Design a protein with these regions (language model features):
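Positively charged n-region of N-terminal signal peptides that target proteins for export
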Residues: 1-4
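Short, glycine-/small- and polar/acidic-enriched structural segments
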Residues: 25-154
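Sec/Tat signal peptide C-region and signal peptidase I cleavage site
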Residues: 18-22
Length: 154
C-alpha cells in the first residue's frame, strides 16, 4: 500500500509541474531595412513578448542587397513580410506553396508627393516632366492612373 501511495504522489507531482520546453525558433524576414513600420516586431524581441509566448524570433532585414523572397522558398526564413500581395499572387501563379497569415496595414501605404503649389490634382500631375513611381506602385495604382487619368508609360 505504501508503494501505491508513493507512486500516486510522485505521479501527481510530475503531472502538476510545469514542463519547460525550448522556445520554437522562428526566422522572420522583413521587406526592407529596419524602419518605423517594423518597430513592433523589434520591440517584441526587446521586451520579451515573443519569449513569453514560447517563440525564439530572429529578424532578418531585407534591403537593397538582400532579396528575402528566395530565402523563404529555400527554407532559410519561416515568415516573410512583403509590401503587398503581389508576391503572393505571383507565387500562386508559379506554383510556389505560399500562405498569407496576416495583414498589418489595412491599405498599402503609398503616396504621390510634389513640391507645394506645382500640382493640385492628377490632371496637373499628368503634365509633369517626370513622375517617379515605385516598383510596387507600377503594378498597382499606376495602372489605374494610366487608365483613369491618361498618364503614359514613357
Amino acid at each position: 500500500m505504501k508503494k501505491i501511495i508513493t507512486f500516486l504522489i510522485s505521479s501527481l507531482i510530475l503531472m502538476s509541474s510545469n514542463i519547460v520546453n525550448a522556445a520554437d525558433k522562428i526566422v522572420f524576414g522583413t521587406n526592407w531595412l529596419a524602419q518605423g513600420g517594423h518597430g513592433g516586431f523589434y520591440q517584441a524581441i526587446a521586451d520579451g513578448t515573443y519569449k513569453k509566448h514560447g517563440l525564439d524570433v530572429e529578424i532578418m532585414m531585407g534591403g537593397p542587397q538582400m532579396n528575402n523572397r528566395p530565402m523563404l522558398i529555400a527554407g532559410k526564413l519561416d515568415f516573410l513580410m512583403t509590401g503587398n500581395l503581389l508576391l503572393s499572387f505571383d507565387n500562386v501563379r508559379n506554383g510556389i506553396p505560399t500562405m498569407v497569415v496576416g495583414a498589418f496595414f489595412q491599405k498599402d501605404p503609398q503616396a504621390m508627393i510634389s513640391h507645394s503649389g506645382q500640382y493640385s490634382n492628377f490632371s496637373d500631375l499628368k503634365n509633369a516632366p517626370t513622375v517617379l513611381v515605385s516598383k510596387d506602385g507600377q503594378f498597382s495604382f499606376w495602372k489605374w492612373m494610366v487608365n483613369a487619368h491618361g498618364f503614359k508609360d514613357e
